[in-house]
């Protein structure tokens, strides 16, 4: 797979976030709605070398881009420590598209999947 085809996450357009997040999925009882919560610990996007305002989280793969504006910064002892991005889907097709991105992102970053029981 060519490097430009790798799935990636960006908080600033054109700048890939190298920190791999913990991702938690929840789904509604009907299976069509749900959310994915991305938790980045000490992301580069919060480092002193980055400038500008974070206006969202872009999930980019060979199919295109998924965007969410639901991004929060969590502070520990007055220092920015975590970025938390939440992607909400409301249809099965949105979920299917997200899962294609998630699988591509996992392959690009050598990640696996585990189900909480």
Swiss-Prot record:
One Gene Ontology term from the biological process aspect of the record: photosynthesis
InterPro entries the record matches: Psb28_c1_sf, PSII_Psb28_class-1
Localization: Cellular thylakoid membrane
Keywords: Membrane, Photosynthesis, Photosystem II, Thylakoid
GO cellular component terms attached to this protein's record: photosystem II oxygen evolving complex; plasma membrane-derived thylakoid membrane
Membrane topology: Peripheral membrane protein
HAMAP family: PSII_Psb28 (MF_01370)
Quaternary structure and partners: Part of the photosystem II complex.
Record family assignment: Belongs to the Psb28 family.
Protein name: Photosystem II reaction center Psb28 protein
Organism: Prochlorococcus marinus (strain MIT 9515)
